[in-house]
Structures are given as structure tokens and as C-alpha cells.
Curated annotation (Swiss-Prot):
Composition-biased stretches (Low complexity): 69-84
Post-translational modification: Monoubiquitinated.
Ligand binding (Zn(2+)): 19, 23, 35, 38
Subunit annotation: Heterodimer with RABEP1. The heterodimer binds RAB4A and RAB5A that have been activated by GTP-binding. Binds TSC2, GGA1, GGA2, GGA3, AP1G1 and AP1G2. Interacts with RAB21, and with 100-fold lower affinity also with RAB22. Interacts with ubiquitinated EGFR. Interacts with RGS14; the interaction is GTP-dependent.
Region of interest (Interaction with ubiquitinated proteins), residue spans: 1-74
Cellular component GO terms, alphabetical: cytosol; early endosome; endocytic vesicle; recycling endosome
Keyword terms, alphabetized: Acetylation, Coiled coil, Cytoplasm, Endocytosis, Endosome, Metal-binding, Phosphoprotein, Protein transport, Transport, Ubl conjugation, Ubl conjugation pathway, Zinc, Zinc-finger
Organism: Bos taurus
Domain of life according to the entry: Eukaryota
Compartments, as annotated in UniProt: Cytoplasm; Early endosome; Recycling endosome
Full protein name: Rab5 GDP/GTP exchange factor
Summary of the tissues where the protein is detected: Detected in brain.
Keyword Calcium listed: no
Amino acid sequence: MSLKSERRGIHVDQSELLCKKGCGYYGNPAWQGFCSKCWREEYHKARQKQIQEDWELAERLQREEEEAFASSQSSQGAQSLTFSKFEEKKTNEKTRKVTTVKKFFSASSRVGAKKAEIQEAKAPSPSINRQTSIETDRVSKEFIEFLKTFHKTGQEIYKQTKLFLEAMHYKRDLSIEEQSECTQDFYQNVAERMQTRGKVPPERVEKIMDQIEKYIMTRLYKYVFCPETTDDEKKDLAIQKRIRALHWVTPQMLCVPVNEEIPEVSDMVVKAITDIIEMDSKRVPRDKLACITKCSKHIFNAIKITKNEPASADDFLPTLIYIVLKGNPPRLQSNIQYITRFCNPSRLMTGEDGYYFTNLCCAVAFIEKLDAQSLNLSQEDFDRYMSGQTSPRKQESENWSPDACLGVKQMYKNLDLLSQLNERQERIMNEAKKLEKDLIDWTDGIAKEVQDIVEKYPLEIRPPNQSVAAIDSENVENDKLPPPLQPQVYAG
């Protein structure tokens, strides 16, 4: 993809983000500008062409061998192995290396493959010797619970997924490109089976494929991310060194339409950097893409707040380059390669995830090829900045003033905020102490009033009257009763 740098800033024609074959999907530098679908077609064509050339070479060598054999009568009995057998053996070895997803779902091939695999490797199957990590167990449980809602279709998907993981366990010696091809074939085959046989709606197919990707890549991550057989780590170190060497690049040089003096914009920039750094902590390609998407949306929000209008593509790419330079994400190339190799290809070909990922690839390519002309600098200044002899930031510091330095302005603003917070805290503490004193005084006053009342009106407890009723007693004071009620004594 060609990147153009003009005085008004970095510009990328949006058509250059698309597949160069003209299919309408997003292309990728790792696929030589093709989309996933077209790249696979071109790759298979080149592969078939190479196989055909090897076949023709083998036939030519066989003819030469036969001619030499016919001309040499003395060596007829000594030669026990003809070149045809050698050719057959070579062809069988090539055929064995061709891995397609049909091998994973064909019953006959599974039986034969398992026998050969058992003989070649004695390691236990990952379905038996499962990883015990908490994350893997959690993802497995979530995947099983998710498939339960699909009943018979879910059982078939789970069976196919387990077979795929078992097959991949014995294919770790293959190159990372061949393992990637196996994974992409598996994605494509499962999606086609659900759409044709299962009659599953496209939106549900997408959700199922997301869960399948999450399940299998969580298990395969430590084997296929930045493997030792590739130069991914070397590329990571190279891009990190390159970004550190470009630490002097300012937003003005890239024509970044973002004003970090605005607090909301500064927060968005920090969030964007955090998101793109967080990408390395994710294990699933879809989750890594989600970090790129969140980073990009924060960039668009920062531009929108600064310009008070929606951001354009010409505004987005320079800002993304600036975020990458400022954040220097860890293992950037490894993450890009991992997403390219093992993400569900439909995500990279269409949608906002594919668009943002393609722009990130463009940003990395721009950083790798960045020169004086790209930044509208003279070659002399560019060389001085790269060598560390001087820096544009040093030149700005010569005319330093508190109002001109963004960092110092932010520092004074923060100090003012701290001073205000300190005053508020002192007021709150004084009011809290006053409230505490009032509560103590109120409690003491209530206690004193209660004590005064108790002393003034003491509580006396008297024993109950134990006297019995004396109605028939002679000691009753009858004289106090009215005459009709006075008892009369009769002589008996």
C-alpha cells in the first residue's frame, strides 16, 4: 500500500485499503494486498503450480534415469530401486503434507490418520491431558454451555472442534503457515456446514464462529503465538527500536488534528494508548481486534472533540500513527501476525474491525518507511534528530515559558486543583470535628438531664399488701358503714 505525505498531512486513498483483486473486501500487507479469500486462492494456485513443476521435473529426471539405465547394461542387477518408486514415495510425502479440513471430518481418513499419528507420537491427546489453567477451564465451560442451546447442531460442532484440536496437537511440527491454513480451512468448513446442512441464520453463524475461535485459540495460543520457528520476535525488536528512535516526532509533524490541552481529548489519547497496549494481554484474535477497535474509537472521539465535527479517514490515520509512536505497544508485529494467521477471516475482510486492523497495518508500514519527506523535514534535520544530536523539543524549550509548555501548564492546573481539594478537605475536617463535638455535648446533656430526674424523683419499690379479705372478721370497722349496710347480730 502506498502512503502519500503532503504538506496537509498523511493521506491514504481508501481504495488502497481494499483487496487489490477488486473483490471489495479489505486487503492486508501480510497477504500481499489481497483479502483472506483471494490470498488463499492465489496461494493454492501458486502451490499447485509448484507441485506441477516438481512433477514435470520428476518425470524429466525419470526419463534421464531410464536412459542412463538402458545404456548401462553392467549395472542392471545392482539397481534394486527404480526412480518410479522414488517418485511415488516423494509424491506420497507431498500428498501427506497437504492438509485440508476434509481430513478432519472424513471418517476413513480419521481412522488412518490416528493410527499413523499414534505410531509417530506417543504424547497423550490434549482431550485427555487437558490444560488446568483457570482461563482455559472457564472458556471450555462457557463453550459447552453456549452449545447446549443448539442441541444436535451443538453436539456436532463440539465433536468437530475436539477432533480439530486433537489433529492440531500432532501437527505442531508443521510450519506456522501450514497451521494457519488448517485453522482457516476449519473455520470455512464449519461455517459452510452450518449454513448448508444446519440451515443456521448468518447472524447466529457469526456468534457460533466467535465462540469456536475463542475456544480453540485459547487452547492453541501458547503454541502458535510468536513461535520460535518464525522471525516474529526479530520483527518485534526491530519495530520497537524504530519507534524508540522516532521519539522526537511531534503531532505537528504528522499533522495530527488533536489538541491535548483539552482535558477530554487528553483523556481519550491516554485511553487509546492503554487499549492498544492491552492488546498484547489478550489470547483470542477477536479480543485483540476489540482492543484495536476501542483504541480507534477513542481516536475518533478525540478528533471530534478537537474539531467539533466528525473525523475523516485523513484525520484518523495520522492520529493512529501518533498513538502507536507514543505507546510503543509490546510485541506489535507478533500480535498483527497472530491476528492475520488465526482470526476468523470474515472479521478481517469486512466490518469496522477489518477497517481498523487494516489501518493499523498501514500505520506500522508507514513507521517502518518513515523518512524526512514524510515529515516535511530536510534530510539534514531528519538525520540530526535520528542521531540524537538535537531534538525539535529542545528547540521549543529554548523559547520556554510556563504558558507555552503543555506539560508545565498541566502541572500548574493540577497544582491548582490540589490546592482547591486541600481547602475543601480542611473545611470538611473542621465541620466533621464540630459535628463530633456537638454530638458529644448533646450526649452529655441528655445524660445529665436523666440523672437529675432520677435524683429528683427516686423510684421506690414497696412490697405488696399480704392482708387477706376480712369480710367475716369481727375487726371490721362496721360503724363507718351506712345504716342499711351495718351488719345485724341475731341471737341464735
